[in-house]
Each structure stands twice: as C-alpha cells, then as structure tokens.
Regions:
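N-terminal secretory signal peptides that target proteins for export/translocation
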Residues: 1-2
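Sec-dependent N-terminal signal peptides
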Residues: 5-13
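C-terminal motif of bacterial Sec signal peptides marking the signal peptidase cleavage site
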Residues: 15-17
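Bacterial signal peptide processing site
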Residues: 19-21
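N-terminal cap/lid segment of alpha/beta-hydrolase-fold proteins
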Residues: 24-75
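The alpha/beta-hydrolase serine catalytic core
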Residues: 44-52, 57, 63, 127, ...
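Serine-hydrolase catalytic machinery in alpha/beta-hydrolase-like enzymes
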Residues: 54-64, 76-145
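Primarily recognizes the serine-hydrolase "nucleophile elbow" in alpha/beta-hydrolase
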Residues: 137-187
C-alpha cells in the first residue's frame, strides 16, 4: 500500500513540476493606445479587471492580444475579435484565425489569462464571461484607433461566448464605459 502511495506521489509531483507555467508577455511593457501599423504582432493593452458590470473602483490590467492581418492589402478592413473559452488559448484556434484571415478579415485574438496568471478556469471563479467581455470592449476601442479598420465583430465560444451574447443587450451596453460598439457578435 505504501509503495502505491509513493508511486502516486511521484507521479503527481512529476506532473506538477512539468506543467507549463503561465508567462505574461506584457510584463515590463506599456499599454498600446493606438494601432498605426498594419502588421501582425502581439499587442499589450489596458482593460478593466472586473468580474461584473460594476466598474466603480475597479483596477485596470495590462493584457495581450495577437493581431493578424490578411495578405491581401486593402484600403480598409473589417475585423473580428476572438475570445477563448475557459480552457484558454488552444492550438486549434489557429485554424479559426487562418480561416478568417483568408476571408480578408483582420483578427485580434485576446489572451484573457496570461496577465491574470491563470492556466485555465473550469470553475469560473477567477474570471467571468463579463471579464472576457470587458477585455473585448477594450480591444474594440484599441482597434478602432486604426483608421483602416471599419467594422469590428465579436466572436467567442464557451465561456468566451457570454460577452457576444450580452453585447446585444442595450441594458448591458449602457453600463459599459467604452463608447465603441460591435457591428456583429457570434457565440
């Protein structure tokens, strides 16, 4: 019995020590407030760190997103902001990005977890769908600083799908301290 417990203990310790640490690419960087260049890159931007729709005395947080432009050069672009589910950014999301970029859309994929030091949140106790929505509206505000970006849609799934649904409601939009609004949203 002790041998089995010892083996189980070794396996658990090995798994924990091999787990990938969450790294925040925005540490020691400043928030971008304007997007001038039409190039693919990682962007650090400021969001409201709120679990709910009460924004009084809430801290801001520097989070990141990856910006992807289509190879086709245009005078103007439409864009999509992508928000992941409770499992965080996944490799298969790249296929979604490629599909949307191939359609001629600019894609901005938000990482809601790195700055918050979260690997995944299956309990929804650390962040909420509203937290994700706040990040998406902050990303929208940033994207709209680029005069080449016209319409911006909002795409989310699983926990990340809460924001696109809520963004359709006037009562929710009235509470959000950002003026810009999404042209469309899909959950």
């Amino acid at each position: 019995m002790q041998y089995r417990l010892f083996i189980l203990f070794v396996i658990v310790i090995t798994m924990v020590s091999c787990a990938k640490k969450v790294e925040d690419p925005c540490i020691n960087k400043s928030a971008k407030t304007v997007i001038k260049q039409n190039i693919n890159n990682l962007i650090c931007f400021e969001s409201i760190d709120s679990y709910d729709l009460n924004y009084k005395n809430k801290d801001t947080i520097l989070i990141n997103g990856e910006l992807f432009y289509p190879n086709i050069k245009r005078d103007y672009y439409d864009a999509v902001i992508m928000t992941h589910g409770s499992g965080g950014k996944r490799r298969y999301h790249k296929k979604y990005i490629e599909l949307l970029v191939d359609m001629g859309l600019v894609v901005f994929q938000i990482d809601h977890y790195a700055a918050r030091k979260i690997k995944y949140d299956k309990t929804f106790s650390k962040v909420s769908g509203i937290t994700f929505m706040n990040d998406a509206y902050a990303a929208l505000k940033l994207l709209k600083t680029n005069p080449k970006i016209r319409n911006v849609g909002y795409l989310g799934w699983s926990q990340g799908g809460v924001g696109p649904i809520l963004s359709h409601f006037k009562s929710v939009n009235d509470l959000i301290p950002i003026r810009e609004r999404f042209k469309s949203a899909v959950a």
